[in-house]
Amino acid sequence: MNWLTNVVRPKIRNILRRETPENLWIKCPDTGQLVFYKDVEQNQFVIPGSNYHMRMGALARLRSVFDNETWYDVALPEVTADPLKFRDERKYADRIKDARTKTGAHDAVKVGYGKLEGLGVVAAVQDFDFMGGSLGMAAGEAIIRGLELAVEKHAPFIMFAASGGARMQEGILSLMQMPRTTVAVQMLREAGLPYIVVLTNPTTGGVTASYAMLGDIQLAEPGALIGFAGARVIEQTIREKLPDGFQRAEYLRDHGMVDMVVHRHELRPTLARLCRILTKTPLPAVEEIAASDDAAQDAEAAAATEIVVTPPEAPSPTAPQA
């Protein structure tokens, strides 16, 4: 046995071949710059420098919204996983299984209930990583359950939309979720509760033809692609060249389809302010804000919300007149 050949060299070779994690670096789609993944994650998945908004998973989105990154997961109704026994190149059941393994989620929509600057809210998040955030039976039931819970809790409902549209593998059962979710939104509206929609990149297809465009307030993240059909399909249909930036959040804001385009770092305080205005809830005391936010945000929140009232100076005594 050659000790140098069989013991030392393989160990050295293993050190040199040590694998690098696949997600160690992220390439900015806008500038092509390579950015350390942890830096992007800590920056709410916004690329430092270019401010490009990457897609956010459902869990990361909920953590960014609720106080102390704490919320209650809402139990969602069970539905038939593959009602049509659909198969194209692969079985639909296998696609669902792979998506669940990849994301750790049961389906494309996750619903949570918690506090937003002390105010109870229900939030539903579509995860684009789960089969393109497509709307199927499970996603429709999740959104409807979230809206029902908002009525039960008498709380605002915030919808973070990100989808390629209806899930084709479920056929008409998927399309049926469009009117069902629309009716549920109307139920929330009749209860006098706010429905706020945040359009993220991308929000397209049947989702924009239903609940995603029904908000009392329509917000969008910078650069988000929002529309029904794709730009290429529209150009081929109308035989005209579309304007630059067509279907982007800023274009829709400038043309009245979106109320505000909000940077992700400003989204949480903006949502809290809108919820308080729409529910006519007074601002919390400085002490309540400090209790609900983490230590890093306490000083900023107190400085931003504290109002110092200076009493008027007492008038100087007037000398008696002769």
Curated annotation (Swiss-Prot):
**Which transformation does this protein catalyse, written as a reaction?**
N(6)-carboxybiotinyl-L-lysyl-[protein] + acetyl-CoA = N(6)-biotinyl-L-lysyl-[protein] + malonyl-CoA
Similarity field: Belongs to the AccD/PCCB family.
Q: Which UniProt keywords apply?
A: ATP-binding, Cytoplasm, Fatty acid biosynthesis, Fatty acid metabolism, Lipid biosynthesis, Lipid metabolism, Nucleotide-binding, Transferase
Domain CoA carboxyltransferase N-terminal, first and last residues per copy? 24-293
Q: What does this protein do?
A: Component of the acetyl coenzyme A carboxylase (ACC) complex. Biotin carboxylase (BC) catalyzes the carboxylation of biotin on its carrier protein (BCCP) and then the CO(2) group is transferred by the transcarboxylase to acetyl-CoA to form malonyl-CoA.
Q: In which pathway does it act?
A: Lipid metabolism; malonyl-CoA biosynthesis; malonyl-CoA from acetyl-CoA: step 1/1
Q: How does it assemble?
A: Acetyl-CoA carboxylase is a heterohexamer composed of biotin carboxyl carrier protein (AccB), biotin carboxylase (AccC) and two subunits each of ACCase subunit alpha (AccA) and ACCase subunit beta (AccD).
Predominant subcellular localization, coarse grouping: cytoplasm
Task: Give the organism, scientific name.
Answer: Rhodopseudomonas palustris (strain BisB5)
E.C. code: 2.1.3.15
- Entry's localization field: Cytoplasm
Its cellular-component GO annotations read:
acetate CoA-transferase complex
Please report the name of this protein according to its UniProt entry.
Acetyl-coenzyme A carboxylase carboxyl transferase subunit beta
**Can you name one GO molecular function term for this protein?**
carboxyl- or carbamoyltransferase activity
Single GO BP term:
fatty acid biosynthetic process
